[in-house]
């Protein structure tokens, strides 16, 4: 089984699409900022590091096997400007499970773009790819990301205390999850945030 999204993935204000070499400057613009990288599993990146990822892990356009991530750029539909990225990891084909992550340029925070992009990636995971369960693993100090997971209808299932040694400290991890049936029930009831909020 392979997961073949049709690009771009559209939402009211955004287009999600695979990143390419033309995006190097835009990717470096936010992935080089130390504060952006504080809670994510990578260090600030320069153009060389971004180029290596574009030729490797980020070159993927489809998901063909467990453990593969799909990284999509978050582009403003009105201007074509790349302002962040979202990731869908296909964790298990057998269990139809995945994980999401998101990174946004800080100049665009507080405007609902991260919520809209994550909402769209969950729609892809559940409604287009048929996954059953999606998780988000959040550093407990990353309050914005935890609030975003809750806005998406994800429930906090665990608080793992000093779960791993991460960037020079013992890190607590919050695990959030949502099932496909829960996602569809929330969408049908109108309880999910508007994709643009």
Where are these regions (language model features)?
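Acyl-donor (CoA/ACP) binding surface of acyl/acetyltransferases
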Residues: 1-38, 71-197
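Short helix-to-loop capping/linker segments positioned immediately adjacent to catalytic or ligand/cofactor-binding
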Residues: 60-63, 110
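Short loop/turn motifs at secondary-structure junctions and domain boundaries
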Residues: 62-67, 154
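Conserved GNAT-fold acetyl-CoA-binding loop/helix
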Residues: 35-58, 70-72
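Juxtamembrane/interface motifs at transmembrane-helix termini
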Residues: 46-49, 58-60, 103-105, 193
């Amino acid at each position: 089984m392979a997961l073949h999204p049709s690009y771009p993935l559209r939402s009211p204000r955004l287009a999600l699409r695979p990143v390419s070499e033309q995006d190097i400057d835009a990717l470096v613009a936010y992935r080089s900022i130390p504060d952006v990288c504080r809670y994510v599993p990578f260090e600030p990146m320069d153009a060389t590091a971004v180029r290596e990822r574009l030729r490797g892990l980020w070159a993927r356009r489809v998901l063909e096997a467990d453990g593969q991530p799909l990284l999509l750029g978050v582009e403003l539909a009105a201007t074509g400007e790349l302002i962040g990225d979202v990731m869908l990891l296909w964790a298990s084909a057998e269990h139809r499970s995945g994980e999401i992550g998101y990174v946004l340029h800080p100049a665009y925070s507080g405007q609902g773009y991260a919520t809209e992009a994550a909402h769209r990636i969950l729609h892809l995971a559940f409604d287009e790819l048929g996954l059953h369960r999606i998780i988000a693993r959040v550093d407990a100090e990353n309050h914005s990301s935890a609030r975003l997971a809750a806005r998406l209808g994800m429930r906090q299932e665990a608080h793992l205390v000093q779960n791993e040694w991460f960037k020079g400290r013992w890190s607590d991890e919050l695990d959030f999850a949502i099932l496909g049936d829960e996602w569809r029930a929330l969408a049908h009831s109108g309880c999910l945030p508007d994709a643009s909020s």
